[in-house]
Curated annotation (Swiss-Prot):
Natural source organism: Shewanella amazonensis (strain ATCC BAA-1098 / SB2B)
GO terms of biological process kind: glycerol catabolic process; glycerol metabolic process; glycerol-3-phosphate metabolic process
Binding residue positions for ADP: T13, R17, T266, G309, G410, N414
Binding site for ATP: T13, T14, S15, T266, G309, Q313, G410
Gene3D superfamilies documented for this protein: 3.30.420.40
Keyword Cell cycle attributed: no
Pathway involvement of the protein, from the record: Polyol metabolism; glycerol degradation via glycerol kinase pathway; sn-glycerol 3-phosphate from glycerol: step 1/1
Enzyme nomenclature, EC number: 2.7.1.30
Name of the protein this chain belongs to: Glycerol kinase
InterPro entries in the cross-refs: ATPase_NBD, Carb_kinase_FGGY, Carb_kinase_FGGY_CS, FGGY_C, FGGY_N, Glycerol_kin
Length: 495
């Protein structure tokens, strides 16, 4: 039967999803299953790897049924995933040695501090482009080896395997035949040298992690193995893989240097493709790996804002100022400006470019005339201001003045926010017609790997624009407003 579809598996932090795309990159069907969030202690976050697999495999079966298609019509299954989340399992039984340690989990903070005290942060920064932070996989692995009884001995004996979620899914899909990851996921582990494209023995020694745990690193645009849906039917290639933010970058076809996208979710993730040059940031950004137009390694600068959509949730859940996130556009548009009010949502500290974990939220500029609408508008504007901070840092690091910003994520439906983002940044904001850009990135990678699409040029026109938001604010007003934001941020910083 003619293969007319590609399936993307989108394994996220709170749910597993499967999406079917046709040859024109139209979304045909979606299936989604949430799974349990486990919080054993303050600052600890876990997932059950078997529940991740159960939720993801069931969505795969379900989405084909919803689309009304058979497995022999599927050209490839591509994968995108929550990055950094760490799983270790027995290579013979497939049983995890403990729950997955999620990217949000802070339990390995003491390990990071010990490595910093040894003066090792510059080494890790130079080789991986990352900071020594519990966010990344390497110190999570070390924590498991040091704290779960018997695991280090089993690891040293070669009995165990490590993987981020992509690796775990491929291993399960191929029934334990394939232990593999891609460069985008490997680059988030603190163990992968982004310049040589290899696991780094010096970093492994510093972390005391045996190399036998690690998966083979293959191209993001490769065929890794095959799978049968529910153990039946045609063998489908498992092909194409990238971490969620890099998949979104590719789904937005930001494959050339200077192209950037911002994902507006709980937080915001802004990535700029820097081509074949790994740009070392001097302004608080991470250097990471992206997927090039040939499927090979490109580099990117990445900045993360901790509180994006979560700021709007705070307005709703803690302050009761709105009933639904969509209400913000209505209330913000009822006033001409914020009446001098700025909200800095540093509720869990500030991420890039400040990296101040002890910064705290501030609401400044309040006068007797300030009302609910001004505060709601200030909350929305804070998302755009924080993104402007990242854009400015990227321009300084890369030497490229951005002209366009591609956007995705739930908050891009808010026209007020998108227009203010364009205004305060002085760049054109492009909202795609297809908002499932992360899944589309995985689908594109899978389809390209098996020849479903021949090259990036063939898929370029399949990614249309819903609306262009052009800057309408004059330079003087933009500068004045941004100075006010910078002053508000200074008040929120810990020192």
């Amino acid at each position: 039967m003619d293969k007319q579809y590609v399936v993307a598996l989108d394994q996220g932090t709170t749910s597993s999803r499967a999406i079917v795309f046709d040859r024109d990159a139209n979304l045909v069907a979606v299936s989604q299953r949430e799974f349990t969030q486990i919080y054993p202690k303050g600052g600890w976050v876990e997932h059950d790897p078997m529940e991740i697999w159960a939720s993801q495999s069931s969505t795969l079966i379900e989405v084909l049924a919803r689309a009304g298609i058979h497995s022999d019509e599927v050209a490839a299954i591509g994968i995108t995933n929550q990055r950094e989340t760490t799983i270790i399992w027995d290579k013979l039984t497939g049983k995890p040695v403990c729950n997955a340690i999620v990217w949000q989990c802070r339990r390995s903070a003491a390990i990071c501090e010990a490595l910093k005290a040894q003066g090792l942060e510059p080494l890790f920064r130079d080789k991986t482009g990352l900071l020594l932070d519990p966010y990344f996989s390497g110190t999570k692995i070390k924590w498991i080896l040091d704290n779960v009884p018997g695991v280090r001995e089993r690891a040293d004996a070669g009995e165990l395997l490590f993987g981020t979620v992509d690796t775990w899914l491929v291993w399960k899909l191929t029934e334990g035949k394939v232990h593999v990851t891609d460069p985008t996921n490997a680059s988030r582990t603190l163990m992968y040298n982004i310049h040589s494209g290899e696991w780094d023995s010096e970093l492994l020694k510093a972390l005391d992690i045996p190399a036998s745990l690690l998966p083979e690193v293959k191209s993001s645009q490769a065929v890794y193995g095959t799978t049968r849906i529910a153990g039946e039917g045609t063998e489908i290639p498992v092909a194409g893989m990238a971490g969620d933010q890099q998949a979104a970058l590719f789904g937005q076809l930001c494959v050339e240097p200077g192209m950037a996208k911002n994902t507006y979710g709980t937080g915001c993730f802004l990535l700029m493709n820097t081509g074949k040059q790994a740009v070392k940031s001097e302004h608080g950004l991470l250097t990471t790996i992206a997927v090039g137009d040939d499927g090979g390694i490109s580099y990117a600068l990445e900045g993360a804002v901790f509180m994006g959509g979560a700021t709007i949730q705070w307005l709703r859940d803690e302050l009761g100022l709105i009933r639904d996130a969509s209400d913000t556009e209505y209330f913000a548009s009822k006033v001409d400006d914020t009446n001098g009010v700025y909200l800095v949502p540093a509720f869990v500290g500030l991420g890039a470019p400040y990296w101040d974990p002890d910064a705290r939220g501030t609401l400044v500029g309040l006068t007797r005339g300030a009302n609910r609408n001004h505060i709601i508008r200030a909350a929305l504007e804070s998302i755009a201001y924080q993104s402007r901070d990242l854009l400015d840092a990227m321009s300084k690091d890369s030497g490229v003045a951005l002209k366009q910003l591609k956007v995705d994520g739930g908050a891009v439906a808010n026209d007020f926010l998108m227009q203010f983002q364009a205004d305060i940044s002085g760049v054109e904001v492009l909202r795609p017609a297809q908002t499932e850009t992360t899944a589309m990135g995985a689908a594109f990678l899978g389809g390209l790997a098996v020849g479903f699409w021949s090259n990036v040029d063939e898929i370029r026109h399949k990614s249309g624009i819903d609306r262009r938001f052009v800057p309408l604010m004059d330079d003087k007003e933009r500068a004045t407003l941004y100075l006010g934001w910078q002053d508000a941020v200074r008040r929120s910083l810990s020192s």
